[in-house]
């Protein structure tokens, strides 16, 4: 049985494909999750994360852009962008503890990104989480 971490990793793959210009990925998301053996509750969890992130993508991207110091969104790698998008979605649209969201994102960055990815992901998501905690940003 797949874990939530594995479900999130599969969602990163879906978001990555979507970001590369494959909007058809939405139609095949369930099949792709089945291929990766993401089933039952974890499949529902993964689909909710993917669909929610895509649905709120414009708002999520604005939040990310606001916290990119000296960076353009286009300079952020596709994997890192997918991880940030999922992390921001979970920070704003789920009841998960921000520390868990950030830790999961950093672990995904360690596995899927470059050597610099974990620190970058941690910094951006931490800044966004602090803003959420202070109530100065509403989704």
Curated annotation (Swiss-Prot):
One of its GO terms (cellular component) is cytosol. Keywords: RNA-binding, Transcription, Transcription antitermination, Transcription regulation. GO terms for biological process: DNA-templated transcription termination; transcription antitermination. It holds the Pfam family NusB. One of its GO terms (molecular function) is RNA binding. Involved in transcription antitermination. Required for transcription of ribosomal RNA (rRNA) genes. Binds specifically to the boxA antiterminator sequence of the ribosomal RNA (rrn) operons. NCBIfam families: nusB. This is Transcription antitermination protein NusB. It comes from Nitratiruptor sp. (strain SB155-2).
């Amino acid at each position: 049985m797949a874990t939530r971490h594995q479900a999130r990793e599969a969602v990163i793959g879906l978001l990555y494909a979507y970001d590369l210009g494959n909007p058809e990925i939405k139609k095949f998301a369930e099949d792709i999750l089945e291929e990766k053996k993401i089933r039952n509750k974890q499949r529902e969890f993964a689909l909710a994360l993917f669909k929610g992130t895509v649905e709120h993508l414009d708002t999520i991207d604005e939040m990310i852009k606001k916290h990119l110091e000296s960076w353009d969104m286009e300079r952020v790698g596709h994997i890192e962008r997918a991880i940030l998008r999922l992390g921001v979605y979970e920070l704003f649209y789920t009841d998960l503890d921000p520390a868990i969201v950030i830790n999961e994102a950093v672990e995904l960055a360690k596995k899927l990104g470059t050597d610099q990815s974990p620190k970058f992901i941690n910094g951006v998501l931490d800044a966004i989480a602090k803003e959420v905690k202070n109530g100065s940003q509403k989704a």
